[in-house]
Curated annotation (Swiss-Prot):
Role noted for this protein: Component of the adaptor complexes which link clathrin to receptors in coated vesicles. Clathrin-associated protein complexes are believed to interact with the cytoplasmic tails of membrane proteins, leading to their selection and concentration.
The protein's name: AP-2 complex subunit sigma
GO molecular function: clathrin adaptor activity
Name of the gene this protein is made from: aps2
Sequence similarity: Belongs to the adaptor complexes small subunit family.
Complex and partners: Adaptor protein complex 2 (AP-2) is a heterotetramer composed of two large adaptins (alpha-type subunit apl3 and beta-type subunit apl1), a medium chain (mu-type subunit apm4) and a small adaptin (sigma-type subunit aps2).
Primary localization class, coarse: membrane
InterPro entries linked: AP_complex_ssu, AP_mu_sigma_su, APS2, Longin-like_dom_sf
Superkingdom field: Eukaryota
Organism name: Aspergillus fumigatus (strain ATCC MYA-4609 / CBS 101355 / FGSC A1100 / Af293)
One GO cellular component, as annotated: AP-2 adaptor complex
Keywords for the protein's UniProt record, in alphabetical order: Cell membrane, Coated pit, Endocytosis, Membrane, Protein transport, Transport
A Pfam family recorded for this sequence: Clat_adaptor_s
GO biological process, one term: protein transport
Gene3D superfamilies named among the record's database cross-references: 3.30.450.60
Length: 145
């Protein structure tokens, strides 16, 4: 179970968070961001699933929260539901840490968001599944500032 990348984009396609776990050139990254947004943005939340076949035997698992799309690219053989829950877990941690997280929190506190992301995902794999453990680590990091 390895991630290729994690993207958080708004409805307009602006990338608010990008973490790459596979080597891509800058041109490929720009192209992938556009392709992922064009793939997930027009999908109907009520009648279509949160899993989309992608290229090179991968798939996009995504979840929309308000105006943000949280997308992960995984191998086609990986368990989609595990990653869907991992996305939800990440958003729950963000929500608890920032207190009702919004897009502006991601923009202005990007360094904290990346720290949270690194606590949950490490080297493209799910590292921590305990919300309390992650929040305790983040409290310790906050005290260092």
């Amino acid at each position: 179970m390895v991630l290729s990348f994690i993207l958080v984009q708004n409805r307009q396609g602006k990338t608010r968070l990008a973490k790459w776990y596979a080597p891509y050139s800058d041109e490929e990254k720009v192209k992938l961001k556009g392709e992922v947004h064009r793939l997930v943005a027009p999908r109907d939340q009520k009648y279509q699933s949160n899993f989309v076949e992608f290229k090179r035997s991968t798939k996009i698992v995504y979840r929309r929260y308000a105006g943000l799309f949280f997308c992960v690219c995984v191998d086609a053989t990986d368990n989609e539901l595990a990653y869907l829950e991992a996305i939800h877990f990440f958003v729950e941690v963000l929500d608890q840490f920032f207190g009702n997280v919004c897009e502006l929190d991601l923009v202005f506190n990007f360094y904290k968001v990346y720290a949270i992301l690194d606590e949950v995902f490490l080297a493209g794999e799910i590292e921590e599944t305990s919300k309390q453990v992650v929040l305790t680590r983040l409290e310790h990091l906050d005290k260092l500032e």
